[in-house]
């Protein structure tokens, strides 16, 4: 097993996740099987209860693990399926060590950071790195490890020490370190001092970088590269210029041009890893597909505008998987994507009274969009604005996709304005004692724990069965006319089964349900170009080269190409089945 560690210095949020994902993707083009581990040095057990406005989105895995958003990057770039154990947090590793101490596993010894915690980290990495993550079912050849945060922070100290020891445990030819640093440009001059200081700190902790990936707003000058190489004690070929590009999908090719993979191939002796001809051909095809995808991205002229009506729009990372899914779909449709960010509460009449400009600007964005997306979320703020957006899309014939909460607000809007129940709502927003039974469109799922927040939702990969007589459905056609699909869930509330008949009698058809036939998973509005909602989160399974079908449908409908896309999908799926 080969290990490539990606660490960061100077500041956080510097792009370690994209660089780690891009490095892994390039290793896959050699035919290698690649896995990934993210280390997050915070005390939380997982990301499930963390505010999206503070930490960005919570990414959900097949096994229901609620993890850091970077695991989404790994899955999207590498085409792999990770588990909750691929995300190590301080809280998780401390809990593991304390549980072992309580069981008496340490035989009465004084339990310490070194060696007990650091050994536990190393054991965890070695165990998880061997878990198969792709459709081959085989043990990976390379593990990318991203160390979150900034080297030198007190929170990451145990992990840095564990990795220092780990490099000797596995051997130099099996361990490489890429350090990501910032090269700011001040008054037109590229400054290397922050990188020099970061590498000095890293070396003082016992970690020697094999490559230094320099993040900069512009291409590095040759003199800057030489200066970093000289003062950081590396060769110029070990300094990688990771300047800003118009899309993060260009980063793998940017690294490829600078011979990063050639260096890692030599440094880790990757030529000794046994590969079949099929492995090498699959890797070569991946590179070709990626190059074609980026070329299509650059050559696209037509623009598709999607209004994203959310409640966490002040931090775009809150909807990272959603925006990436829209990007994947747009590239597949050969369109340039323009996301119109609309804060849901700004669509509400109360905003007009307080700030007319904000109100009118938000409605102008919504009305100019080619398609409308209402993503998931929690709480009451902005709900009425989302309902108004769903109403606009339904009445105006604008393509619409509602995800999780988006499905629920679309159902509430339909119950209010089509069925004629103006007081319809959700028991999430109003106590059930304040809602008449017939007005409870969305209810708390009976099996969910109301007392505890962490890890108590309906989580992970679950089946959705397409219902009889749903062959007309666009969303079913987008999935290739299959009988069932498996998608990831994260919710506590569901459509009230008691209102389903009334909704369906007016054309609001629940074309997909769970295996019991009671829990509503997908709806589609008959007679509308594309008005779809999913209780699950399709954005969690979208891949760069294989977009999520509901998002693909939204962008295709917004581009006027839905019929062609469905035809192509059915031809492709039909050929595969023959």
From Swiss-Prot:
UniProt cross-references to InterPro entries, sorted A to Z: Class_I_gatase-like, CTP_synthase, CTP_synthase_N, GATASE, GATase1_CTP_Synthase, P-loop_NTPase
Glutamine amidotransferase type-1 domain: residues covered: 305-564
Keyword tags: ATP-binding, Cytoplasm, Glutamine amidotransferase, Ligase, Nucleotide-binding, Pyrimidine biosynthesis
Chief localization: cytoplasm
Subcellular location: Cytoplasm
GO cellular component term, pick one: cytoplasm
Pathway named in the protein's UniProt entry: Pyrimidine metabolism; CTP biosynthesis via de novo pathway; CTP from UDP: step 2/2
GO molecular function, one term: identical protein binding
Residues passing through the membrane, by range: none
Catalytic residues (positions): 404 (for gatase activity), 537 (for gatase activity), 539 (for gatase activity)
EC numbers: 6.3.4.2
Reactions performed catalytically: UTP + L-glutamine + ATP + H2O = CTP + L-glutamate + ADP + phosphate + 2 H(+)
Any Gene Ontology biological process: 'de novo' CTP biosynthetic process
Family: Belongs to the CTP synthase family.
PANTHER family cross-referenced by the UniProt entry: CTP SYNTHASE, CTP SYNTHASE-RELATED
Role this protein plays: Catalyzes the ATP-dependent amination of UTP to CTP with either L-glutamine or ammonia as the source of nitrogen. Plays an important role in the regulation of phospholipid synthesis.
NCBIfam families reported in the protein's UniProt record: PRK05380.1 (NF003792), PyrG (TIGR00337)
Protein name: CTP synthase 2
The organism of origin for this protein: Saccharomyces cerevisiae (strain YJM789)
Organism ancestry: Eukaryota, Fungi, Dikarya, Ascomycota, Saccharomycotina
